[in-house]
């Protein structure tokens, strides 16, 4: 069998005609300066703001400053291996993080990589780290309660699903404890929690994870950590990574709680990056867009309309103040963005009032409409009682000749302070909160010695579990107050068996 030359040439011609050259074109630049988590590169003329770029050693960066003849890049990883003259190339992608239920129960860094030593996370879903907040028509007003399990919060500054409630106070005033108790209390509430630790010590994060595990809360919680030893870019990105993971659940009709602990450290990291990028400093050396840094993060918390699935994302941002100064730059910014604040006072904390919530300066602007009817009825006068007690307490120190009405107010106030105290990691179901606050505000505790109030409450809750389960169930299901007679019968029934200390 002979092969003819014409056939061979025809085949070759056909192959040449069908050949398509696949030329891969990518923008490549050169590093001209590097240090402190920042690199400047020349030659990336078409790079987009916020685009991911890749250095020759595989470390990723984020294009932040687009200048006339160079690009300022924040480096998302170890920068000590990057040298002047190294190649840096565009990826054409913006930054994304892994999302999905596979992350629940895990501890990850802001890039979504596991740091808990439990192996890889098997998820293929990702979401862009910067995404627009839901629009006005996609939202619904906050109307469902988020029970924190903390009496002082659920009664005085109630939080609703989809709200942004700031927790503000000096260091060591119990801010993290409030958030952890809230997460622990979501156990049977079908809520996914995300705890974002920004600039915390690694030992502190370890303690938080162990606390959550011990109380069975890690099975519905994601922990995102950018510890104090991490470069500033990761501290800056951590809150956005946390809210992005939460949005995946929110847009699928689920309810999410995101805790940012704390945004002061994120603002400091962003200030550091901005100054290194030579952006002009403003008040307290923060850059001009530090307000937008927090507003675009917190606006992503929302209660979605029924048409969008009815999911919600509740944000609890933390701000650390210096000596109680809430009028500093970052505290005032975040107060103006959020829907209320819980102010923790160090004076109260050190005097033994814990949680150290200052009822006078704490406020919830939208939570009232989310509070259950039973709670709003029993807690109606609490704030006024506390405020008048604090005022009278100062006067009472000067003289002992007080009329009966003033004495009664002081007695009621002292008992109110005692009832609102709560142990660490002991969140209380809302129906039990309602009953003890009913007993307080209706005068049933006025004849119990102040020193016995805490013991009375603990024993009363145990007594209710065995003797008044139907009353608890009625409040839980109807969310309304039962008949006064039922309450009085239960409280008086327990008072008969309660033994006051001598």
Swiss-Prot record:
PROSITE patterns: ATPASE_ALPHA_BETA. It catalyses: ATP + H2O + 4 H(+)(in) = ADP + phosphate + 5 H(+)(out). The keyword Protein transport does not apply. It comes from the Bacteria. The record marks 362 as: Required for activity. It is an enzyme of class 7 (translocase). GO terms for cellular component: plasma membrane; proton-transporting ATP synthase complex. Produces ATP from ADP in the presence of a proton gradient across the membrane. The alpha chain is a regulatory subunit. F-type ATPases have 2 components, CF(1) - the catalytic core - and CF(0) - the membrane proton channel. CF(1) has five subunits: alpha(3), beta(3), gamma(1), delta(1), epsilon(1). CF(0) has three main subunits: a(1), b(2) and c(9-12). The alpha and beta chains form an alternating ring which encloses part of the gamma chain. CF(1) is attached to CF(0) by a central stalk formed by the gamma and epsilon chains, while a peripheral stalk is formed by the delta and b chains. Belongs to the ATPase alpha/beta chains family. This is ATP synthase subunit alpha. The lineage of its organism: Bacteria, Bacillati, Bacillota, Bacilli, Bacillales.
